[in-house]
Amino acid sequence: MNRKASTKVAVTIGGKGEYASIIELDESNFDQRISESPVPILVDFFASWCGPCRMISPVLDEIAKEQGDVVKIAKVDVDNSPNLTSRFGIREVPTLVFFKGGEVKDQVVGLTGKADLISRLKTLN
């Protein structure tokens, strides 16, 4: 049985420890998860061997923790999802693609800061 793990980030809401998940997407679940999301989704197209991808990962964890009620954070491993990589024209990693209502609304290629990402996410809400 193929189970996809998701990274759990601890979040304190109302004094209770809860979790905001960073969703792992692949070719089998991408379209459904993107189209059914009631909130915008920031998808990180990354590679495990990519230094800048590893550098932006803690930033995405922070955003998931702080903004988890208004946005979802997801990751796609480009080496394991070549059809998605081709479909969205991913040529460099990290590439961050912003979705709302199942449609691409914005994209950032390369390493960027938390403030820029939050600003872009706010334009989607």
Segments from the language model and where they lie:
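Proteins that catalyze or organize thiol-disulfide redox chemistry
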Residues: M1-L42, A47-K72, N80-N83, R87, ...
